[in-house]
Structure formats: structure tokens, C-alpha cells
Amino acid sequence: MPQNSAIYAVSRIRSRERSLIDRETVKRMSEGTAEEAWRMLTEMGYGAKPDAEYMDSEALIESELERTNALIKEVTTDERLTDIFFLGADATNLKLFLKRRLIGADAGGIYAHGGLYESKELMRMVQAKAYKPLPEKMAAAMDRAEAEIAAGRIDPARISTIIDQGYIDHALASGNAFVTAYFKATCDFDNLIAMARMKALGADEKRLETLLLTGGVIDPKAIVKAYQSHMGEGYAKGLPAGEMKAELQKALEEYAQSGDAAALERARDNALMRLASRGKNDIDTIAPVIGFLLAKRQEAKVVRLIMTALRNRLGADVIAERMRMLYGE
């Protein structure tokens, strides 16, 4: 249950921040064996799951994320804002269940945990094509997606974009400065990633237009124009002013060197983490609470990467390279 004291919320978060796995521990885990890394995780209480099956690191990760989600829901002073960051999992699952309905079989994809809705409830919505229980803007987006399908325009990428747009519209409507900055940056980075992916596929600008989000600092029309001019070298310098301009410029420069959309994805994840950490020392806002949630999610990615690599007996140099790919720095 949410409570009213920001100071209490921040103090609880501060006490848990000490348990975040630091880079030195990550380094030691990656340099040992899978068994040694497992022992380190269990000894530090990661996942708090003493009955976990030996070497079932995924169970530890899910347990740790569940504990984190429970803490956030307990200490938040504004459930409306923290819920936005849980809704991302629901948006992912809506895409998955809709795809499964259209294909009529298991369409693949990994079910996302930690949303606000039970998976069965989301599945019922998709089967019934009735989305009223969702937040208004997400429900409207699902209705638009259903209209596309009903008209025979079954384009998975476009439908995914429509659902993402509904989620972003819901977040931007919060009116909170931190949440707005976070999702504006998400929108801009995701649009640049879409541009890079379409370039790799040799798609035309009409195709790109259908996959761009609105709500960021960069006008989608400017992205299409840059795409038409083959993303000239001057594009990064011509980005509109905004608090993420330097981050976006750096990401585009890295992409220009590698030609790999993954460079933009890494830049996005790192930029969003830095944005989230800006309010780490606040004592009267929701920023430290959300920042901790995002840090724990990043930590889970690191643990998963290391344990998977060690189980597959990959060398330390390979793990180090994959860590660089994850962090991008």
C-alpha cells in the first residue's frame, strides 16, 4: 500500500541501495565459475530464496524483482506515477497475446513479469477485444490496433508501435517532470532505433513513418527528412535543443561509426539510467524510488548475462565484451 512520507520512502530505498551488486562484485562473478557465481549470489541474499533449486538463477532473478516491486508498491508516495513503470510489462504482454491470437498458436516471445494486471486478465481482454479495464490512453490504443486488424492491415510492427504510443501517451499525461523527461527521451531514442532498423532493411520513408512515435523532443518529420537524406553527417549536430541532446548526439555518432542499431539501444539504456539517477539524492520526490526500480532491473540483466555465459563456459574475455555490449561504456 502507498504511504504519505517521501522521507520514509527515500530512507527505505537508501537502505536497499546498499544491496545493489557493484561493479567489483560483477567482475569477480564473471571471472569465476557458474557454481562460484551462484554461491556469491546466494551468500549475499540475492533473491532471498533459500529453497531455490541449485543453479536456478532465473528463479533468483524473478524473486529479486518481485521483492523489488513489492517494496516500490509499499513505499511509493504516488502510486499513479510508480504504476506507470509497471505498465510497461503489461504493454509487452498485450503485444504478445495479440500476436498469439492472430497467429492462432504460440507466437514466441517471453512473457513479462511485474505488470499491474494478471496475465489471465490481459488474455481475456485480448480475446474479447475489450480493453476498458486499461488506463484510458492504453485502451484507446488497443482499440486503434483492433481497428487496423479489422481493416485487414495486420502489420505486427505497426500494431506494436500503436500499443507503445498508447503507453507513452499515458506516461506523458502524468504531468510529472521526471516521468515526462524519461518518456520523452524514450520516445526519441526509440524513433532513432526504428530509423536505424529500417535503414538496415532498405525500407522507404513511408514504412518508417508508420513506426515512429510522437511525444519526444525530435519531430518525427525531422527524422523522416534525415532518413530521406541518408542520415547525413550533420544530422546529429542539427538535433533540437533539449536536456538529452548531448546523449542523442553521442548515440548517433556511435551509430554512424558502427552502422549497428544495437549501438543506439545501448545508448538509450545507459542514457535512461543516467537520467533516472539524477534524482538519486532527492529527499522529497519520487525520483529515488523509480531510480532504484530501474537500477534493479538493470542489475537483473547483468546477473542473467553472467550466469548464462558461465553456464555455457564462455571465456572471461567474451563475458567482458558482452558486458560492454550491455553497458556500452
Question: What do the PLM-derived regions correspond to, one by one?
Answer:
Residues M1-E329:
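N-terminal domain-start signal
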